[in-house]
Amino acid sequence: EVAYDRGYPVTMNTPENTEFAAEVAKAVSGKVDTETAPLMGAEDFSFMLNERPGAYIFLGNGDTAMVHHPAYNFDDSAIPFGSSWYAEMAETRMPAA
């Protein structure tokens, strides 16, 4: 007998949301890398993407191990860039009247 459990669904970005996030990132930082190879890892964010359109995006953290790896070292200097990016996405999507 073989027991088989489906774990996480595929994490599939919505093209429109991915493009929007990349455009805002470029406006905030002046550059964006959209030429990364797809990853085969599981991510619980995929459940959210099954319910609503969106995009799972990497901010960039320099030359370190991936998140959840014991050797991962978060680069605190990325915080202002990430904060500015998220704030600009919110302000662009929901501008003040």
Question: Over which residues does each language-model region extend?
Answer:
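Metal-dependent amide/peptide-bond hydrolase catalytic core
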Residues: 1-97
